[in-house]
Every structure is written in structure tokens, then in C-alpha cells.
Amino acid sequence: MKVALSIVFLLIISTISFGQTTPPSESAMSRFLRYVKIDTQSAEDAGKFPSTEKQLVLARLLEKELKDLGVQNVRISQEGIVYGMIPGNLAANTKVPTIGFIAHMDTSPAVSGANVNAIIHKNYQGGDIVLPGDKTQVITVKQNPDLKNLIGDDIITADGTTLLGSDDKSGIAELMTMIDTLKQNPSIKHGNVAIAFTPDEEVGGPMDKFDIEGWGAKFAYTVDGEQLGDISNETWSARTATVTFTGRSTHPGTAKGIMINSSYAAGDFLSRFPAMIPNRPETTAGRVGFIHPYSTTMSEETSTIKILLRNFDITGLAGQEAAVKRVIAATQRKYPNVKIEYGSVLGYLNMKEVLKNYPQLTDYAIEAAKRAGISAQLRPIRGGTDGSRLTARGLPTPNLFTGGHNFHGKLEFNSRKGLEKSTETLVHLVQIWAERSK
């Protein structure tokens, strides 16, 4: 009899249609447009978390909104992480693991996120999109073929002078709308759902401080991906290298025979990359890793170049380090009087080595997307997420799509469909965990 009742229960909760639900009190698009107005750009090398105080403006807003939606145990940690828990509504004897969802509050330091002027291109009918604040910024169909799937949709961009902030305020808006939807529809059955919003994801933020035990999730998902349907259980393995050039400074008026200008050696080092380092971001795609000098500081006495090393294969990182050292050796031969030093730190490892042991995480996500009308596929991330580091710490955490495109640049965009379908997928996902668990 218990088995029969369980089957009936599962059939009931699996047949709830998202289209039959009571709508949330605020749409994902409306929330998104509010959140992008808040500048939350993080900063490299701040030496603290959060790296910028302005991230706490959004953290406090989310804290209030979570409490208003009835989320329990809402708190902001010393590092600026917002935590909360949505209690399950299943029978007491139903065993469903607590599932967590994470989105990050900061935007990339690469481009300004201040004074974002979001533009809604209603009922998009095809063609390139010229951004009105800087008409040299054009979202082209050639470089963005997914635009062909957005005919009739409302596309959201910035005006061409800033980031939009879709990375990752889309994820935040979608999670908040999921929470709202669950509140409005108690007939949607789910287990405990843990929520977290993190600072400084873009600059290697405080995931070593993330309170996994106190948060309570057994499995989690980051909501930090791009186009609809992209689900990721694989990221880069990542190191960050620093090359330091040390010369000798003196007053330029009396520098003859004395000054050793380190910036010349640093410039020579960079100039060798096109010939000696073929795999760079602008020359690679798919599963091919890259070496990327991304930050330089130069002076006569000391110059520093920071370099990203990225590879899906952990053993490939050693080869990339060797390649950088060959460039250093060539530069050293030309500038023997400049001291050149190399160092690197490990950022995160490809999470696939752990997640391959938990295929249900991505299987359930693919099924949830299917129920939302989205064809989903596993696609490796040419990047990293908070989930990379949480997975390494023992909390398996793949990544889900948000509908966004062109992260970290002025051509960033999302759409009404992207936001809504991502939200639907999240709602279906918590239902599926309730259905499939015993």
C-alpha cells in the first residue's frame, strides 16, 4: 500500500505544469533590471572580502528580499556571502537531500559596471544590434548566431558604455523568482532548498570561507552559465602566474651607465608571445587551453606581468608553465642585467573528476530544462565558477545556464525568454529532486 501511495504521489507532483502556476509577485526580467542598476564591480588584489564595499549594497537588498519571501536562516557572513534556506514541503518521512543554488553578486573588473543603462530591444526581428551609447559597439548575428533563436523576444543590453551585468545578476534574478514562485505555489513539492549569493567570484573570492556545513546542502548548482541549455560539469584547471622583472632606478638626469629599466625587458617578454605562445584566448576555442597575459605594471625598478594559465587537463598546466619559462629564458638572454622571477598559484581544478561520480546532478538538470521546453546539453566551461572550488571542497556543484551571452564585455546581453526559461528550469529541478529521491 505504501508503494502504491508513493507512486500516486510522484505522479501528482510530476504532472504539475509551470504554465498552471500562480505567477511570482515580480518577474525575473523586472528583478534583473533592478539589480543591474547596482554597481557591484569587484577588485583585484584588494586583500579583503568583499573586495569592494558596494557589493554589500546588493547583499543587504537580497537579505531583505529573501526575508520578505519567507526564506529562513537568512544571514550575511563577514565575507559578504548571503545565505538562506527554503524549508521543504514534503511529508516528514520523505528523504530528499537538501539542494543548494548559488549565484554571484559581483561583476567583472574588466569593464565598468557603474551607471548601467539597460536597453530593452522589444520584439527583436533579426539583424545586428547597434548599442546607442557607443555606436561602434555592435552585437552582430555573425558573432552571435544564437540571435536567430531570439526572433520575437525582448533582448536586454547595456547602452554600449558599460557591462550589462548579466554575469551574474541574471542568475540572482532567476533564483529570486524561483523562490517567489515556490512561495506563491505551495502545490509545487520540493525538499529543503539552500540559497547563497557570493561576492568576488570574478576575482577568486572567498569560497574557502563558504560555510558548507552550516548551509546544509548535500549537492548544489551554480547559476552562472550562458546560453539556454548549456549545463556544465567541467571547468578549466587554472593557475595564475606572475613574472617579475627587477632593474635599477635612478634619477633620469644622471642615469647614464646606471639605470636598468625593467620595463624594456617586460615589453620584450610580451612581444614574444605571438610567436612563442600560439594558444592564446584569441586563437583558441573548444577544449584547447590558453596562456593569457592580462595585467601589467611597469616602472624602471620593477615591472610585473600576470598571466592566466588554463587547461582542461591538469597535466597540461605543467606544459603551459614550461612554455612561459621558455619565453622568460629568451628574454633573459637579451636583458642579462634584469632579474626575472617566476611564480604561480593554483586557482582551481577541473571539477569533472569529482562530478563524474554524481551523474544524477546533470541528468536531473537536463530533464528540468526539457520540461521547460529547452534542449539541453553538457558543455565544458572555458572558465571557472564558485562551484569549481566548492566541488574540490566536497560539495558537488555543476553549473546551470542563465540565458546570458558575451560576459565580461560591453556586448553582453540576455532576453526575456532567457530569464524566464532559466527560472522555469530551476523550478522544475527542485521538483525532480523530490520525485527521484527516496
Model-derived features: positions:
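A non-catalytic alpha/beta surface segment that caps or lines the substrate-entry region
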Residues: 46-96, 100-102, 106, 116-117
